[in-house]
């Protein structure tokens, strides 16, 4: 869509045209026409009632489209007394993103929809009108035009009523068709497309033919077209036209005119004796349809046919004949030189216009036998042998094709057994082969001989391996088969205890759910905006509760219990930079992408402009603390937009810190956030037990004591429900691995849960030390002994090695060599249990623990 600048609206003047009509009921004056005039232009634009106009909106690139229903002047308006009543159309980008899939297809480039919503405000100011457009109504079975150059032509096929797309009502369709017929300025886009499809080369040919007519033709009626040229006819003429060579161009209409005219100018064109071969192979149609270049007795037939064709076709159908420059010696040419476009993307060159005449044709026919007589006999023999070879290759390839298609077992006959008499008869009956360059002939012969040497096989060829397609579409890998279901009770429990599994209900948060639901519902019913701050430690169900509220509100909106709204969710963890939140909101709101600054400006215009928002928007901002910046402009805008009356924006923010507004926000930001706040307390052990039982309903995989143990353990530490679910899932894995009979696994006991809790709450360093070898554990004890002896938390490898040897002697173990101890030190350093200097220092490199000494002692203690 073209960019309609809204900055020029202030330099336009609007005035009424015609005498006013008084409305007796509403007591205001109505008009039938208005005019728009810009100060820097002298022209005026007149718009009448019933026309379609563009109206200034939020997006300057996509203004609103409407039909003028009434023009009137209302004295009760303070700012703009010139008013208009319109019938709105809606673009596809204005449809909510969550409902765009209801169309069921890809919308057209210039497609709009009849907006069937009586509650929408249709009273606008005349000063918001940008200009007039054309709207064409299409039947449901008509095809939407593609690639239109006129961006001010729109097409409508369906209507939109905020719920679904429907076909246009019959009365609306008839009304739009009547308006289309009344508009005389409307032109069908297909005609413009046909006109624009004409190639410039045909226009140049037309000018050349007209120039030749003015000089040589006596009758202009032969060259006048009686009907327009269609692209299909032009393509057919191109296929049957003469081959194009770089230097000479001739049109059949012009040549026929020159043949018919008795008083034509004499031109003597002499050709060289040796004709250079053409670069292209001539088609068979050219050899049979143009024998006049070789047979002088058929010149009259050519002249007669050209005369007939000139009466039927227009000069645009002029066929082009080009001859190579080295093959011509021009003695007398026309004084006028034209700029001839060369086809195929070559550079254009200035060449003289040459017209073939009967005299020239006779002279050429007379010279051809001389050239053939002067040619040596060896060339004729070579030409004959090449013709025979090509004929044999053709027969063999034809035989190979027939043998592949037929399944009958036939005996293979080589090409050498074909009789010479048959080849001579074929040579006499077939048309002469086109002249080619030696390189092209030898290349074709090599490729043909290579195919002829292949013996046909009765067994089918191997199927080719699938290759990467040329135009591959990137996509995510998908399964060919569905995922296998759970095979036992433990697998079923593991699936239900997953964090991503959606439970049937959300227990233990009924009060918080009701408070959030009432807040959002009141804003939707009042069509106003507001903010709510939700805080709580991780894993307390904040985001899950809000999702449940939105799901229930969407179901209520479908049942017409609450007004429809648009839901958008943004997570601060998924943003690379805080200002990218504008880009995400704009993309989910309108489906467009823009830079951060441009998106912020568009959103501010949408939420702060009067009458811009059509429905309420509910915005969920998760991880709000990650949107903090030095100027705090992002938080300020998110909390300031809902304060505007026209915004209809409800913002729900979620963070982990309860005192976040007072701790990191400025006063001007926290004051706009308001006092509507909610805190999610950590789960108690009874609530965690209820959550586990609700997920494990009808699945007996845990002992009652085990569930009670894990609920109390997690509630005492953090109250995180996600941590509780992860511990239970790990306990099911431990129970499944420890069971002797996989087919009949037992229940998850308290021992399994204690083991899972130890893994979950213990450090990975402690686990690594416990699972290390005896030599590695002895080396760690030597490090602790050296630290205790020196009083420092750093020692050289040589000092640690002395302590290591002493400990091995005390325990009666064979102490390792220096190299073995060096390898042990390097391995512990690779595991990041030690911080070791590079090995170039050898025994003097320093060693330091990467974990605390208490953790090492706890891991090395004997159980």
Curated annotation (Swiss-Prot):
Keyword annotations from UniProtKB, A to Z: Acetylation, ATP-binding, DNA replication, DNA-binding, Magnesium, Metal-binding, Nucleotide-binding, Nucleus, Phosphoprotein
Binding of Mg(2+), residues = 622-623
> Domain of life here?
Eukaryota
In-chain residues carrying the UniProt-annotated modification N6-acetyllysine: 329
Q: Where is the composition biased (Acidic residues)?
A: 419-428
Site-annotated residues for Histone H4K20me2 binding: 94
Query: Example GO biological process term?
Result: mitotic DNA replication checkpoint signaling
Query: What post-translational modification information does the record give?
Result: Phosphorylated during mitosis.
Q: Where is this chain primarily localised?
A: nucleus
In residue numbers, the region (Necessary and sufficient for ORC complex assembly) covers: 503-863
Gene Ontology CC annotation, any one: nuclear origin of replication recognition complex
Q: Which Pfam families match?
A: AAA, AAA_lid_10, BAH, Cdc6_C
Q: Where is this region: Disordered?
A: 186-261, 274-315, 401-482
Q: What does this protein's UniProt record list under function?
A: Component of the origin recognition complex (ORC) that binds origins of replication. DNA-binding is ATP-dependent. The specific DNA sequences that define origins of replication have not been identified yet. ORC is required to assemble the pre-replication complex necessary to initiate DNA replication.
Q: What is this protein called?
A: Origin recognition complex subunit 1
Organism, as annotated: Bos taurus (Bovine)
């Amino acid at each position: 869509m073209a960019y309609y600048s809204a900055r020029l609206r202030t330099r336009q003047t609007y005035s009424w045209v015609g005498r006013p009509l008084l409305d007796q009921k509403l007591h205001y004056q109505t008009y039938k026409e208005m005019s728009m005039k810009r100060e820097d232009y002298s022209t005026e634009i007149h718009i009448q009632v019933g026309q379609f106009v563009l109206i200034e909106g939020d997006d300057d690139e996509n203004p609103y489209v409407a039909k003028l229903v009434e023009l009137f002047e209302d004295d009760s308006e303070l700012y703009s007394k010139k008013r208009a009543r319109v019938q709105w159309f809606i673009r596809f980008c204005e449809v909510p993103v969550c409902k765009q899939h209801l169309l069921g297809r890809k919308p057209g480039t210039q497609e709009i929809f009849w907006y069937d919503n009586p509650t929408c405000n249709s009273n606008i100011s005349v000063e918001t009108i940008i200009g007039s457009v054309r709207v064409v109504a299409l039947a449901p079975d008509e095809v939407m035009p593609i690639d239109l150059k006129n961006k001010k032509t729109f097409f409508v096929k369906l209507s939109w009523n905020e719920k679904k797309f429907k076909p246009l009502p019959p009365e609306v369709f008839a009304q739009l068709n009547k308006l289309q017929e009344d508009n005389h300025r409307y032109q069908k886009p297909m005609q413009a497309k046909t006109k624009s499809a004409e190639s410039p080369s045909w226009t140049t040919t037309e000018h050349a033919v007209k120039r030749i007519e003015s000089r040589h033709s006596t009758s202009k009626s032969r060259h006048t077209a009686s009907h327009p040229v269609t692209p299909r006819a032009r393509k057919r003429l191109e296929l049957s036209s003469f081959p194009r060579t770089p230097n000479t161009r001739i049109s059949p209409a012009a040549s026929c005119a020159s043949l018919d005219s008795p008083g034509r100018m004499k031109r003597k064109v002499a050709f060289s004796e040796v004709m250079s071969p053409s670069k292209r192979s001539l088609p068979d149609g050219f050899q049979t349809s143009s024998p006049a270049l070789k047979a002088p007795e058929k010149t009259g037939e050519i002249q007669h046919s050209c005369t007939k064709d000139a009466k039927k076709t227009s000069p645009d159908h002029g066929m082009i004949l080009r001859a190579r420059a080295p093959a011509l010696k021009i003695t007398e040419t026309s004084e006028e030189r034209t700029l001839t476009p060369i086809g195929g993307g070559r550079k254009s060159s200035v060449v003289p216009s040459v017209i073939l005449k009967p005299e020239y044709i006779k002279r050429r026919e007379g010279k051809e036998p001389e050239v053939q007589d002067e040619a040596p006999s060896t060339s004729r023999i070579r030409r004959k042998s090449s013709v025979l070879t090509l004929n044999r290759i053709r027969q063999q390839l034809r035989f190979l094709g027939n043998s592949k298609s037929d399944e009958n077992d036939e005996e293979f006959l080589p090409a050498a057994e074909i009789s010479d008499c048959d080849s001579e008869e074929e040579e006499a009956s077939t048309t002469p082969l086109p002249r080619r360059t030696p390189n092209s002939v030898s290349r074709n012969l090599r490729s043909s001989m290579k195919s002829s040497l292949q013996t046909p096989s009765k067994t089918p060829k191997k199927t080719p391996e699938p290759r990467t397609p040329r135009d591959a579409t990137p996509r995510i890998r998908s399964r060919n088969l569905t995922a296998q279901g759970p095979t036992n009770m433990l697998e079923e429990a593991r699936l239900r205890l997953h964090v991503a599994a959606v439970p049937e209900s959300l227990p233990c948060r009924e009060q918080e759910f009701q408070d959030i639901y009432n807040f959002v519902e009141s804003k939707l019913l009042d069509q106003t905006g507001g903010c709510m701050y939700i805080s709580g430690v991780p894993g307390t169900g904040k985001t899950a509760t809000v999702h449940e509220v939105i799901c229930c509100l969407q179901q209520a909106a479908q049942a017409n219990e609450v007004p429809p709204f648009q839901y958008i969710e943004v997570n601060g963890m998924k943003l690379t930079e805080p200002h990218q939140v504008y880009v995400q909101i704009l993309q989910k709101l309108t489906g467009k992408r823009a830079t951060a600054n441009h998106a912020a400006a568009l959103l501010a215009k949408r939420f702060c402009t009067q009458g811009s928002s059509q429905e309420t928007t509910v915005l969920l901002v998760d991880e709000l603390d990650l949107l903090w910046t030095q100027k705090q402009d992002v938080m300020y805008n998110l909390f300031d937009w809902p304060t505007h009356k026209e915004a209809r924006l409800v913002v729900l923010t979620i963070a982990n810190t309860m005192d976040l507004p007072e701790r990191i926000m400025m006063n001007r930001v926290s004051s706009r956030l308001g006092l509507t706040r909610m805190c999610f307390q950590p789960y108690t052990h009874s609530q965690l037990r209820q959550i586990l039982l609700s997920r494990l309903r009808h699945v007996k995989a845990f002992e009652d004591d085990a569930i009670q143990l894990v609920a109390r353990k997690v509630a005492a530490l953090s109250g995180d429900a996600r941590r509780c679910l992860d511990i239970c899932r790990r306990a099911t894995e431990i129970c499944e691995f420890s069971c002797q009979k996989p087919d009949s696994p037992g229940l998850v006991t308290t021992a399994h849960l204690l083991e899972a809790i130890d893994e979950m709450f213990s450090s990975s360093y402690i686990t690594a030390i416990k699972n290390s070898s005896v030599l590695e554990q002895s080396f760690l004890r030597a490090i602790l002994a050296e630290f205790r002896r020196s009083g420092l938390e750093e020692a050289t490898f040589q000092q640690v090695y002395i302590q290591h040897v002493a400990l091995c002697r005390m325990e009666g173990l064979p102490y390792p060599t220096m190299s073995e101890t060096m390898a042990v030190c390097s391995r512990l350093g690779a595991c990041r249990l030690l911080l070791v200097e590079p090995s170039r220092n050898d025994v003097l490199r320093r060693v330091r623990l990467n974990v605390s000494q208490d953790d090492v002692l706890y891991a090395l203690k004997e159980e």
